[in-house]
């Protein structure tokens, strides 16, 4: 016996590509404002880093990008800083450009040509107690920080900050 299911969908119920992009970006902003602070608090993280390269993205990174971004660009660095006293989350791109409307660029390549040094300076200025990075022996989706980027991160951070890295 073969069963056929018929789903009736009117054209008016399907969002246009533009409207889907708007909805996705609204949902992303909601996650940044409401879900991310709680998750960082639950994990006892003051800071969380996402570092990816074009064509080799951290699986989590794609869930943090706006609708019109399909991938990382060159080396994409995103830093989330949770200030519990002020109940805020800074969303910073260590990139030459903003990542959509939700993540603002904090790197001026003309003033500091070294992206890793710029990242290190931004982290040091905030002096977090715990810095989350994505690596895991047990969960593939939590193992997005590639070895090369991990080594560059450790090489460019002062020892006082390297000791604060956790996964």
Which residues does each PLM region occupy?
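Bacterial Sec-dependent N-terminal signal peptides
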Residues: 1-13
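A composition/biophysics-driven feature that prefers long, compositionally simple stretches
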Residues: 11-167
């Amino acid at each position: 016996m073969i069963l056929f299911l018929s789903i009736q969908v009117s054209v008016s119920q399907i969002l246009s590509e533009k409207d889907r992009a708007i909805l996705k970006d609204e949902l992303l902003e909601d996650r940044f404002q409401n879900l991310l602070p709680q998750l960082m608090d639950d994990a006892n993280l003051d800071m969380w880093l996402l570092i990816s390269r074009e064509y080799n993205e951290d699986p989590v990174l794609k869930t943090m990008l706006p609708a019109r971004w399909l991938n990382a660009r060159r080396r994409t660095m995103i830093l989330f800083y949770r200030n519990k006293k002020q109940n805020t989350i800074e969303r910073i791109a260590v990139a030459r450009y903003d990542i959509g409307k939700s993540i603002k660029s904090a790197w001026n390549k003309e003033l500091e040509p070294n992206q890793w040094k710029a990242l290190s300076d931004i982290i040091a200025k905030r002096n977090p107690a715990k810095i989350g990075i994505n690596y895991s022996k047990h969960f593939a989706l939590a193992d997005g920080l590639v070895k090369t980027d991990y080594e560059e991160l450790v090489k460019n951070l002062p020892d006082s900050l390297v000791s604060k890295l956790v996964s």
